Amino acid sequence: MSKRILMCPPEHFDIEYEINPWMHVSDPVLPARARAQWQALHDIYTRELGWQVALVPPQPGLPDMVFTANGGLVVGGRLVLPRFRQPERQGETPWFAAWFAQAGYTESLQPRHDFEGEGDALLWNDLLFAGYPWRSDQPAHRELAAWLGVTVVSLQLTDARFYHLDTALTIVDEHTVAVYPPAFTADSLAAIRAHVPQVIEASTADAMAYGLNAMSDGRSIVLSDRATGLIECYRQRGMQVCPTPIDEFQKSGGGVKCLSLELRPPGG
């Protein structure tokens, strides 16, 4: 199944502040390397997998706008805009809102509570797994359920290094997710297992390599080239595995999924 993805070129990507444990202004981005890694991901989507990629223009002064996953959530053609917790990222919202409006997304909601888009909300079949509390508030989950008409399963994250849900959980296919168990409370891990027949447990090494920050269509999966255990696991499952370097973006706490927002059509 071909996906449609929203990305943002990394023209202004850099470490200008520290808002998560990965970010250190003393460890700056190497711009040429970041551009090459972003382009490699873009080319995997478009050339290897045949997915469609739309681009939102990068804006000066918004270095993390490259992480489009936080720019919204699209389910069934309905849009949820982010309400960023960190002041450093709040300026991104009008630019994402303008892009979505121009693209024809006329039904939109911005929650009253903090919510950071697809980074904290992953759709698995007809369930929406939603993370909290580092960047999104649990009360926002009720707003998502009402607006999108889906069942929301709230998952509490426990480790600040895995501050968005998409850093600790991958939607692999309609039967399977991959998780890093130490990133969740016992109750949240039990909730995942109660709903999903197959749960792959990632090692600490693979989780720290941002191997769970991945994109899958059920047959093909794109993930960090340093997550060697998960790469082998997916290959043994018969999937097309597309490893790619993302270490420049991990300096800012981002990876493959952070750089990618899925644009689902009505009914999807």
What are these regions (language model features)?
Residues M1-G268:
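The feature marks the mature, well-folded catalytic cores of soluble enzymes
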